[in-house]
Amino acid sequence: MSDDLALQGKRALVTGGTKGIGAAVVSALREAGATVLTTARSQPAQLAHADQFVTADVSTAAGCAMVAQAVGERLGGLDILVHVVGGSSAPAGGFAVLDDQEWQKALDQNLFAAVRLDRALLPAMLAQGSGVIIHITSIQRQLPLPDATIAYAAAKAALSNYSKALSKEVSPKGVRVVRVSPGWVETDGAVGLVEDIARQHGTDYEGSRKIVMDSLGGIPLGRPAQPKEVADLVAFLASARAASITGTEYVIDGGTVPTV
């Protein structure tokens, strides 16, 4: 690996790092040489580097405080912060069934987790005059889907706007802030969804895949992204090769978003 892509000696935190995009990001950063602390609400039964894992719910203020404390105790500081945690657990039924509690859950998980951790960890980055913060948003922030994900889409739009504003404030002080906006990514959870749709529609996996792609308005590349592709982009953005990149959002969606 070329020196400007290497992350030897760098200390990283990845939230939501035990599965899907998060697990791929953890692997990519470690392969590049970084020491990576990761966190999730529960610890998998078999987890490599279990000593570099914190069980915490970062959708809560207490969980964020616990993770921030662990960063200081186990890493002694931070160079790279990747916010992967997010998602939606809202019931189907559209806007009418989403009460204040569901909206608050979406905001806590997809916006406030990042805000609280940034607030706790940024001061040390600013003091050292360097660091990278990467917020994982979603193409739904500009291409929202109906039904259960309306609050999720709104929260991701807020995260994107917050991230851009933060970059303007802290970039002059040496801390870069970047956004990565995935479209459909073929995680284990996504595979399970496709298999469920296949059973419901009496089709095979490829037929079900097409149903999902059509629901997004089509994917010009003809396939979803893989978690490793998103992780490789994150690792690049965390590296010295991206030293002049800040305040930008990188869309990785196979061409799904139809606008410029």
Where are the regions a protein language model picked out?
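Substrate-binding pocket helix/loop in short-chain dehydrogenase/reductase
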Residues: P91-F95, D99-L107, I133, S215
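Short, small/polar-rich loop/turn modules that mediate ligand/substrate recognition or access, typified
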Residues: S171, R176, I245-G247
